[in-house]
A protein has these predicted regions:
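C-terminal "capping" alpha-helix adjacent to the active site of nucleotide-linked donor transferases
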Residues: 222-251
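Structural loop-to-beta junction motif characteristic of Rossmann-like glycosyltransferase folds
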Residues: 49-50, 181-182, 199-207, 225
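Short His-centered aromatic/hydrophobic patch
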Residues: 32-36
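An amphipathic, basic-hydrophobic alpha-helix
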Residues: 2-28, 46
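Active-site-proximal region of nucleotide-activated glycan assembly enzymes
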Residues: 46-99, 103
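Acidic donor-binding loop of glycosyltransferase active sites
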Residues: 26-28, 178-191, 200
Length: 276
């Protein structure tokens, strides 16, 4: 019964999408994926409107696999993801570009720890256990907890080489990327692309049982010399400590890339195809 109801809801969503596409005179539909995008894509197909698809992940999700069959142009953030796709890299926020004059140079190795979600407790707890062994090293940690892990704030603040933040705006995060040398991070495509843009050494700890994050991380191991760790491994903490100690004197080499151009170029390519 539920499947029948879902089918009727889906048909209603398609008709609603047709209504809004006509009402607002939409000429082009751009799809980034997600379940709610599929009715809009199918409505656009029925109305004969051009569809453009961008897939961020190394493994395309179902909606984008379907949408790509109707698309006029297909774009990806990685190679060998979808047939006939143009690789344009990731689509990142323009807010990542801000003034850097105020940033202070540091002789320490700056490590940015980002877990964000409720699934990050294992990652944060592992770092807390390792911090006593790392406090005497030349490390400075910036820990972004996210709103779901604020109970750990006081634990992190007991260490002199740790700065704790509950939340960061996009511009604040950009400044932290600029200052940091290493990121201990999950393996979502947007986060990895942002951190790679700022030349951070990536220690990637994918959310367990998320095959897309493991696939994303493997690409960065192959192409960017990243480090991939499995938090479900029994020796996860020992491996993480060993990797950090190897990098205790690491300072990133900032390339001469124009960050603003790197962010704008994929968008310019897509816009050129749309109006060309």
């Amino acid at each position: 019964m539920k499947n029948i109801l879902d089918m009727f809801r889906f048909l209603i969503w398609i008709f609603q999408a047709i209504y809004y596409l006509r009402r607002y005179h939409i000429d082009i539909v751009f799809c980034k994926g997600g379940y709610v995008a599929l009715p809009v894509v199918l409505a656009a197909k029925l109305l004969g409107k051009p569809i453009y698809v961008h897939e961020s992940d190394t493994r395309p999700w179902l909606v984008n696999r379907i949408a790509s069959k109707f698309a006029k142009h297909i774009y990806t953030g990685f190679s060998k993801v979808l047939p006939w796709a143009k690789v344009v890299w990731q689509l990142l926020s323009d807010e990542l570009v801000v003034n850097t004059d105020w940033l202070e140079k540091s002789s320490q190795t700056n490590i940015l720890l980002m877990g964000w979600s409720q699934w990050a407790m294992t990652l944060y707890s592992a770092i807390l256990e390792l911090l006593p062994a790392l406090e005497s090293e030349n490390f400075h940690f910036t820990v972004i907890l996210g709103k779901l892990n604020t109970q750990l704030k006081s634990d992190f603040e007991t260490f002199s080489n740790v700065e704790v933040r509950e939340f960061c705006s996009q511009k604040e995060l950009w400044a932290l990327y600029m200052r940091s040398d290493i990121a201990i991070t999950r393996a979502g495509t947007t986060s990895l692309a942002e951190q790679d843009l700022f030349d951070l050494k990536l220690i990637m700890v994918p959310i367990p049982r998320t095959h897309d994050q493991f696939a994303n991380a493997k690409r960065y191991v192959e192409q960017r010399d990243g480090i991939l760790l499995d938090q479900d491994s029994p020796d996860f903490k020992a491996k993480l400590l060993a990797e950090l100690l190897k990098l205790k004197n690491f300072k990133k080499t900032i390339t001469q890339k124009d960050i603003k151009t790197a962010i704008l170029e994929p968008k310019k390519q897509i816009l050129s195809d749309m109006i060309g």
